[in-house]
């Protein structure tokens, strides 16, 4: 009996040891990717924040009617969801999906979805939520190429009045252990009252530049979401894998203890049988 128990524990120790090797390796890879993602995030954040200030000034000085400010009359809402292509990143993806579900459940008929990432596509398919477009296999360091493709699709849907409001749903990165799901409205723009005496002269007129300004702003905004999402994903995966490695270490300690106790018991029993046999032969 003891022999069978020892064999079973040995198998479990081998299995947990192999799993620990995988989780430790994935944790190290995620740490390296997170470091790279954070550098990329800081660079993109500076560009995005500067462009946001410029756009705010431009929007406030446009006096003519413009669908990107006044709206286009459509009641449809578009949600662009940023998820990951890979799993094993804790609650990163499910938190985003839950926020989207809570947002659209009151008005499903007027809610449309574009999903980024294999995991988001999989979750939405299980929930029976149809998508307008799907973007997968996004590189670890997203570029303006990926952002531009999505930006052009958003502009096309909005300018053709297929959607009247556009929201980006993504995970804002604060630290490896703290991320927050945000739902950011990007269209139509919100015009603020002029609070200073700033005067801006445009040549050519800003109305002629609006399409280009809009596309560049959406690229910057989407790239910022990508950068936050990648940092959040790798931070969540690093935390999850480090936690799994710690749990594997604890489990191995317990299994080693069980193994040693069982082996000691088997040795004691064997000695007792030998002594008992010797006594019987006297």
UniProtKB/Swiss-Prot annotation:
First-listed, main subcellular location of the protein, grouped into a coarse class: membrane
Annotated localization: Cell membrane
Cell membrane in keyword set: yes
A single GO BP: proton motive force-driven plasma membrane ATP synthesis
InterPro entries named in the record: ATP_synth_F1_ATPase_gsu (IPR035968), ATP_synth_F1_gsu (IPR000131), ATP_synth_F1_gsu_CS (IPR023632)
Complexes and interactors: F-type ATPases have 2 components, CF(1) - the catalytic core - and CF(0) - the membrane proton channel. CF(1) has five subunits: alpha(3), beta(3), gamma(1), delta(1), epsilon(1). CF(0) has three main subunits: a, b and c.
UniProt name for this protein: ATP synthase gamma chain
Underlying gene: atpG
